[in-house]
A protein has these predicted regions:
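The feature marks helicase ATPase cores and/or their adjacent C-terminal helical subdomains
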Residues: 1-255
Length: 255
């Protein structure tokens, strides 16, 4: 970096770990511990999130849980009804918000009962617009939440939610994994950080052509690398045509 101010740094006593990989280890590597996955661009964040969906990981993206709390409440509430239990009217209202007109009669999309009262399946069918065939189906087959909650907001996430549950995770667990751009991660730290070096053409060209561009990218990746407290995994580009090459300088010198 040009015109940088020298600073005195003192290492910690405990030893950390640094690895350089040619692939994104988004499956087994994430089995334990808290992880922060850092990307240079929003497009790479999107790619990583799609991979985490396929693997069934609970995670946050830009600090926000990927699983909507209302969807979790609706799943738990329907499971209780399915088992013959009663739930509160406020929870019925949440369940109804994730059903379409094939599940609820017209005019009943918003639950009209008292939110403080308790209701079972029969109450909802007899008085609050839940369609009769749902109870019939409960007797003839297992009617799980993914068969019943069919509104658009939950339908597009069913495959992911089932993958999470199939791997033994509870949907209301605190996510151990967070995905973010490097810029959005300032101030945040994790024991384990995975730093993806993929670059889009604009920053890559700037870092090759101008001193200001080189300085800017050096600062960005310095922020990314220093988020790690114990373990840092640096990943070569796997999708983009370009990567931040200076971060691999010492590895190439050693080889």
């Amino acid at each position: 970096i040009s015109n940088r101010i020298d600073k005195q740094y003192n290492p910690r006593n405990d030893e950390g770990e640094r690895k350089v990989l040619n692939f994104r280890p988004l499956n087994k590597e994430l089995d334990t511990g808290d992880w922060l996955i850092l990307c240079r661009t929003h497009e790479i964040v999107k790619q990583v999130c799609e991979s985490l969906d396929r693997y069934g990981w609970l995670y946050k993206c830009y600090g926000k849980s990927i699983v909507n709390d209302k969807i979790i409440e609706a799943i738990h509430s329907w499971t209780a009804l399915q088992r013959g239990k009663e739930i509160s009217g406020s929870r019925v209202d949440t369940v109804y918000s994730f059903m379409d007109s094939t599940r609820i009669k017209r005019g009943h999309g918003t639950f009209k009962g008292a939110h403080s009262m308790m209701y079972n399946i029969d109450d909802l069918i007899n008085n609050f617009g839940l369609r009769e065939h749902i109870k019939e189906d409960l007797f003839t087959k297992t009617l799980d939440w993914y068969d019943v909650l069919n509104a658009k907001g939950v339908r597009k996430r069913i495959r992911y939610l089932r993958a999470v549950m199939r791997d033994g995770h509870k949907l209301d667990e605190k996510p151990r994994i967070e995905v973010s751009t490097i810029h959005a991660s300032k101030g945040g730290e994790r024991d384990n950080v995975m730093l993806l070096t993929d670059l889009s053409y604009g920053p890559y060209k700037s870092s090759r052509d101008t001193q200001q561009g080189r300085d800017d990218e050096a600062r960005v990746f310095y922020v990314g690398a220093t988020r790690a407290k114990k373990k840092l995994i640096i990943v070569h580009t796997t999708e983009a045509q370009f990567e931040y090459e200076p971060i691999f300088f010492h590895d190439r010198q050693a080889s």
